[in-house]
Amino acid sequence: MKMTAPLMVTLLAAIGLALPSGLLAAESCVGCHAEKTPAAVAQWRQSAHGKAGIGCESCHGSDHDRILKGEAKVDLTRCAPCHPKATKEHQASRHGLGLHTGWGCTRNLPDRKKDECRFCHRQGDEAPSTLVQCARFLKQSSEMAHVGCNSCHMVEGSCDSCHSKHSTDLAIARDPASCAKCHMGPDHPQWEMWQTSEHGILNKSAGRKLGPDCQSCHMPAGTHNVSSGITMNSGGVPYPAGQRAKARDEMVKICSGCHAPSFARRELEQGDAVRSQSLAILKEAEETILDLNTLGLLDPMPDHRPPHPLSGFQLVTDAQMLYEDTSHIERLFFKMKKYDYAKTVKGAYHQNPAYAHWYGNAELKMDLIDIKSEARRLKERKKAEPGQAGIEEELRSLKGRFERGALSAGDYAKEKARLLDRGN
């Protein structure tokens, strides 16, 4: 006869034996929660935790008032003591930086919540555990920050981002749909790319043995380090050569489970080439905007708009750039960098021709056309104003390019001499 937890409690009590502490704690909760949250109790009873006698208090603690207030979070610190290997792998991966890359210090916000401090500070420790900030997060309302940002970025400290809360059925975490909750949309549509790639189509028609899924390539052998084999940061910028070479060897090894190593390396190197070409297009657009800023032609200029949460009244074109409180040309650049560059590069690495070309590369190049056209319009508008000194403007633009490293000292001197000769 299969012995249920309640029956075990009754029998052990009847013969005077001590109850396992976890099971005893669990039963003190189950009596009430079987009525109030029956689904959670049913899931726990069928889980590995329930069958091993790991009770509610082991994860939730015993302070019922804090639990009801939502203050007793079941986060990674609760899971780590029993799952040290998975925790170490997770923390070494990009998922281990998920919260910090999507967060920002809220101490100066009028509607800040005090419990947010715990994401970057340990209890009683003023030194932050990370200096990473996210300007876009800081511009959102608290509701949007929770729903639209933290729902995904909590993956750093919340195991139930991928696993369920009370069930321990690994089929849930092994389902690629669990990745789609976050890895989809205009800025990183890996889910859509995989679904419509040859890998995804084979997976749907013939299963994992013929068509690999997210976990096959990014969590081989069940590792929680989802960053194995990744050669660039989340913004698509390549890692240093040594780190990149090591990661490439890791990915070739993963691909070699189905493909010849030489074939895998060639395919990945094609992705590298697409990345380099795309980055050059992106840099050309960025240089156009930096030049307009030097000339004072952005509309509005950074000092005539609400301050950037991290940089104040400075132009920002890096990973902290905003999609609000900017000029129109910066809005075009945001789409180019955050959406179209990412689709081009990640589409290439995920072997999806439509995302690499039409959704990515074509849009990237048309973005550059739009940005250059807008730059010409702004410059022509300035020329139409009375008292415009053309040579002085060109010299200022030239100096700005030199100071940003876009021109060598030799080229700067040559172009400067040419402009001065023209002005004489």
Predicted feature locations:
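Alpha-helical, heptad-rich or low-complexity scaffold/stalk segments
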Residues: 386-424
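Low-complexity, intrinsically disordered short peptide segments enriched in small/polar/basic residues
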Residues: 5-6, 12, 27, 38, ...
